[in-house]
């Protein structure tokens, strides 16, 4: 079923033209690690006399992202070479590669490019964001969780400019968990910067697993999504699923919390088999493209938390907040939680052997 929603009025206090020729505001202080104590300082200092170095932070982030994408490219190569009958994830990589290739070939992709191994930015992302902002679910929401990827940047802006609280994960959950940004604590000229990774680090308040917060709407990025079922594929790292599972653990969301994605119309597919989805795969309730809004009425159950038997040792080592949660649960229950299979695949010849 496809329905279009009524118009949306943005708070004039945060109009986009308020950023034109605006002076750079003083940077808000944030706590940073000791490894950056010798970096050049910009802006104000925190209580330890250490300033946030935006240039160093962004360089570090881009370097780590590049390494992660290189790892994912290698994983994708191995998965695509594997036997689809014996590898439960190979089919997902076939769809991802087709979509990334299509978006590049037809020039639907936008910077950063190439879009391979990313949540792809796309032509019309801002129009899709405006469609999302017209939803009653967005209008009524007080707290909106939005992924940190490029095509959802305008949604982060509309969230803050709509005087809502923005919850966004720290990049790849490397340095922590989620950050909260509140428009009341931001100057109009800082809103756009606050929608970037650097801005989240500058202006956001880091939260932990004990934070008492209710999330009213979840926005996630997608590589491909089925409009008939709400089945969705991300870029293959599983962060949307992990973030969802941890929010369930915190009691911040439940089955009724709407999950929305914004995509280009070309990202709507019909070849995501429901029977092959994993228990932790997050379906979407609503899809917003530049041209329409689709309510999926998804029949797919939403994950109920973290499925530790599906979580690889590599992912656990990579994400500190997951280790903290696992240790907490094991201490509370007095029993060791299971760990999933390794992400390392056997050699190509062995994978293709029947």
Swiss-Prot record:
Location in the cell: Plastid, Chloroplast
Transit peptide boundaries: 1-51
Binding site for substrate: 134, 235-239
Disordered as annotated region, ranges: 330-354
InterPro entries: FTHF_cligase, FTHF_cligase-like_sf, NagB/RpiA_transferase-like
One cellular component term from this protein's GO annotations in UniProt: mitochondrion
GO MF: ATP binding
Keywords linked to the UniProt accession: ATP-binding, Chloroplast, Nucleotide-binding, Plastid, Transit peptide
Function: May be involved in thiamine metabolism. Does not possess 5-formyltetrahydrofolate cyclo-ligase activity in vitro.
Family (UniProt): Belongs to the 5-formyltetrahydrofolate cyclo-ligase family.
Protein name, as recorded: 5-formyltetrahydrofolate cyclo-ligase-like protein COG0212
Organism listed in the record: Arabidopsis thaliana
């Amino acid at each position: 079923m496809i329905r279009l929603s009524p118009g949306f009025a943005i708070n004039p206090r945060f109009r986009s033209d308020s950023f034109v020729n605006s002076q750079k505001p003083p940077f808000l202080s944030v706590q940073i690690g000791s490894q950056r104590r010798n970096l050049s300082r910009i802006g104000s200092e925190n209580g330890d006399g250490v300033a946030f170095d935006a240039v160093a932070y962004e360089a570090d982030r881009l370097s780590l992202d590049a390494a992660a994408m290189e790892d994912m490219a290698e994983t994708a190569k191995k998965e695509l070479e594997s036997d689809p009958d014996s590898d439960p994830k190979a089919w997902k990589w076939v769809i991802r590669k087709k979509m990334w290739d299509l978006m590049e070939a037809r020039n639907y992709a936008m910077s950063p490019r190439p879009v391979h191994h990313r949540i792809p930015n796309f032509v019309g992302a801002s129009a899709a964001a405006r469609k999302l902002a017209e939803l009653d679910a967005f209008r009524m929401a007080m707290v909106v969780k939005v992924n940190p990827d490029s095509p959802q940047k305008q949604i982060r802006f509309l969230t803050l400019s709509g005087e809502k609280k923005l919850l966004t994960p720290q990049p790849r959950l490397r340095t922590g968990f989620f950050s909260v940004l509140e428009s009341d604590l931001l100057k109009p000229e800082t809103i756009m910067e606050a929608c970037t990774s650097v801005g989240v680090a500058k202006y956001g308040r880091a939260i932990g697993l004990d934070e008492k917060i209710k999330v009213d709407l979840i926005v996630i990025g997608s590589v491909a999504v089925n409009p008939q079922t709400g089945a969705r594929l991300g870029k293959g790292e599983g962060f949307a699923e992990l973030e969802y599972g941890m929010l369930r653990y915190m009691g911040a969301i439940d089955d009724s919390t709407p999950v929305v994605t914004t995509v280009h119309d070309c990202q709507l597919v019909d070849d995501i088999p429901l029977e092959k989805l994993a228990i932790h795969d997050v379906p979407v309730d609503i899809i917003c493209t530049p041209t329409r809004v689709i309510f999926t009425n998804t029949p797919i159950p939403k994950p109920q938390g973290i499925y530790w038997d599906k979580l690889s040792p590599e992912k656990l080592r990579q994400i500190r907040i997951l280790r903290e949660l696992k240790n907490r649960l094991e201490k509370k229950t007095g029993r060791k939680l299971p760990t999933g299979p390794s992400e390392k695949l056997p050699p190509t010849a062995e994978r293709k052997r029947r």
